[in-house]
Regions:
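Generic detector of well-ordered alpha-helical segments enriched in charged/polar residues
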Residues: 1-5, 58-62, 136
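N-terminal capping segments
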Residues: 1-45
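Intrinsically disordered regions, especially transient/low-confidence alpha-helical propensity segments
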Residues: 14-16, 25, 32, 57, ...
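...with weaker cross-activation on analogous glycine-rich loops/strands in unrelated enzymes
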Residues: 43-121
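Active-site signature of cysteine proteases
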Residues: 109-143
Length: 143
């Protein structure tokens, strides 16, 4: 958590996307989560995957039975996945695919506090109500 918090304010996503192996800027939210996990030894120990695509991160946690839907009250260190897009750009329900990812900092009084990379092209702290419709669910690392 301290490693992620130390990055709040970073603009543009360096060093996260270049650490991952990309030669130029990409959508870097998952690179940020992976970079932080690597800095803490979690990738090497199989606790959090190295992933650049949110859908791949979701599948990794689901394959290991380490997934929870958006109805839970998450705990610090869980990986929060978002679903912003509706099917075919229509209004209504989401398309069920993750478009963004961050790290749960804490959950208090029905509010989920997060640390996110590529939130407006910066590392930022954000907050959402528990059960917010754009939260797809949570990866639950086995720390």
């Amino acid at each position: 958590m301290a490693e992620a918090l130390s990055q709040v304010g970073n603009i543009g996503g360096q060093p996260y996307w270049s650490w991952y192996g990309f030669e130029g800027r990409v959508e870097w939210c998952a690179c940020f989560v992976s970079w932080g996990a690597n800095e803490c030894g979690y990738i090497e120990n199989g606790i959090i995957p190295k992933f650049a695509g949110c859908v791949n991160g979701v599948q990794w946690f689901k394959d290991r039975g380490q997934w929870a839907d958006n109805s839970i009250e998450p705990t610090p260190g869980m990986i929060i996945f978002f679903d912003w897009d509706s099917p075919n750009g229509s209004s209504g329900s989401q398309d069920g695919l993750s478009d963004h990812v961050g790290i749960v900092e804490k959950c208090e009084n029905g509010i989920v506090y997060t640390i996110e990379g590529n939130s407006g092209d910066a590392c930022r702290q954000r907050q959402y109500p528990v059960g917010y419709y754009e939260i797809l669910g949570y990866g639950i690392p086995a720390y």
